[in-house]
Amino acid sequence: AVCVSLLGAANIPPHPLNLINFMEMIRYTIPCEKTWGEYADYGCYCGAGGSGRPIDALDRCCYVHDNCYGDAANIRDCNPKTQSYSYKLTKRTIICYGAAGTCARVVCDCDRTAALCFGDSEYIEGHKNIDTARFCQ
């Protein structure tokens, strides 16, 4: 099933192209009843920052994604949060384009891996908006 929701799209503030690409990848891989925003403050690592031990498989996806962005940032002139890239959503998978090892390809691969991981991991409602000071040390 394909999920499309344009309701309220006119009120969405502009984001860096990379974030838009990542959101599109996430929407492509997660269950239809979820929105990409439900993953923005989940566990210890999904969202801004992160600390402690990931609390479940989904949170581990975000932990790995954070580390992947950290590795990408070591590429000369690479800012993973703003880097644009080319990709294709097809046959329930995601294909990244570009030369291996380039900033664009590495960042795309980080986002691709995370989005596919989200699709394969259970979303536990009780792990949304957790008390990070208590559970993420």
Curated annotation (Swiss-Prot):
InterPro entries named among the record's database cross-references: PLipase_A2, PLipase_A2_Asp_AS, PLipase_A2_dom, PLipase_A2_dom_sf, PLipase_A2_His_AS
Chief place where the protein resides: secreted
Cofactor needs: Ca(2+)
PROSITE patterns with a match to the protein in the record: PA2_ASP, PA2_HIS
Disulfide bonds, paired cysteine numbers: C44-C136, C46-C62, C61-C117, C68-C110, C78-C103, C96-C108
Signal peptide: 1-9
Protein name stated in the entry: Acidic phospholipase A2 beta-bungarotoxin A chain
